[in-house]
Every structure is written in structure tokens, then in C-alpha cells.
Amino acid sequence: MGRAFEYRRASKEARWDKMSKLFPKLSKAITVAAKEGGIDPDMNPKLRTAIATAKAQNMPKDNIDAAIKRANGKDSSDIKTIFYDGKAAHGVQIIVETATDNPTRTVANVKSIFSKNGGEMLPSGSLNFMFSRKAIFEVVKPSGDIEELELELIDAGLTDIEENDGTLTIYGDYTSFGTLSEGIEKMGLEVKKGSLQFIPNSTVNLDESAIGELERLLDKLEDDDDVQAVYTNIE
């Protein structure tokens, strides 16, 4: 998703009722990370980052601990991360990231949302060549030299860095998530958010009318309980 459109969508996240919308998604991200890499944060960079992201959103410690414990529960083995591809009007391409214990339910819901809101599902993997998977971290901008920070993190896998309103967005290839996470920690940077995301290789520039037309579809997808993230090629 283009950065300008991403910031626009972030304003919606800020308005979400955290208890009913954001916290369950953060909790599921923690459980999935713990299930994939173990429940010890010291040995699991993805889990450490998921916890840091939750803390940055003021998620209570009890919720975080419960999410980690669920990774060892009898139901956790059924939770899977599944991606669905789709398209909408104006050349918009969409990748939907889900975490679900019932893929049959999830695919039916996602397909219904697309079909009822002017979109269409595509075979899974259809858009892989249109997007690049990246490790992306948002950190509080430190007081020191940004160029020096950039040089320090290149060896850890940094490929790009952006600055916006006191926040640094750090990019790396998805295979560098662990080393980049550790490099950021070693530098003492405060993580606001960290995850693997799909970034479009090319974008479409839409006017306000077209964006308004598409936002209903995107809202419906993001509001589904099984959906963790929605990525688009909108500038």
C-alpha cells in the first residue's frame, strides 16, 4: 500500500475501539508468533516485536500474557496464517492476511465481502509478483544522527528508511526480520510497530471519489474478525 494511503488508513485504526477491534488482532498476532517461534520472547524476535507493538498500543500486560499462553493451548495448533488475493475497480489489487482456526469460514467470509462490495477474489498467489514482502518497523525517532543509525542497521538488513512526524519507518527484506529486529533492539530504539507486510511494486493513483468508493470494501475486510491486515496497491 502506498505510504500516503497507508497514513490515511492509519487514522481509522486510531479511531477503533481498542478493546473490540485492535486488541483482538494484536492478541492473535502474539499467539501466532509464539506458536511459530516459541513462547520465549528472548529466543523469538517475531514474538518480541509483536509484544512491543501491543505495548505501544497500551494493550494490558494480562492480555499479552494470555495471548502467549494460548500458543500452548489445545486450540492454538489450529490457528493458521492464510493469504487471499483479490481485485477491485480502478485496477486496485488487494492481499488479505488472515489468522484463522477455521479456513472454510474465513474464505467464505472474505469471498462474500469481495462479491458484495464490488470486488472479486483471485486464486491465492496470483498477486505475489505484484508485491514484495518486507520487514517493516516503525520506531520513535532518536535524537542522534539518522545517517549513522542507517549505517549501523545496513548490516542487520536495512534497505530503506523514511522519516515522518517523529517516526522512522525502517524497511528490510522479509528474510531479515529477525536480524533487523535485533539490530533495532541493540540500538535502544523504541519500537511502535513491527511486522511483515506486502508492499506494491507499482501503485495506482486514485482521486477522492474512487477512494471513497473502495473504502467500503476495505473497511469490511479489515473489520472481519479473522483478518489481520489488508494490503493494496493504492498510492
Curated annotation (Swiss-Prot):
InterPro entries (alphabetical): Integrase-like_N, TACO1_YebC-like_2nd/3rd_dom, TACO1_YebC_N, Transcrip_reg_TACO1-like, Transcrip_reg_TACO1-like_dom3, YebC-like
GO biological process: regulation of DNA-templated transcription
Sample GO molecular function, one term: DNA binding
Gene Ontology cellular component annotations, sorted alphabetically: cytosol
Domain of life from the UniProt record: Bacteria
UniProt KW Transcription regulation keyword: yes
Keywords, in A-Z order: Cytoplasm, DNA-binding, Transcription, Transcription regulation
Compartments (UniProt record): Cytoplasm
Keyword set includes DNA-binding: yes
Family: Belongs to the TACO1 family.
HAMAP family attached to this UniProt entry: Transcrip_reg_TACO1
Full protein name: Probable transcriptional regulatory protein CFF8240_0424
Lineage: Bacteria, Pseudomonadati, Campylobacterota, Epsilonproteobacteria, Campylobacterales
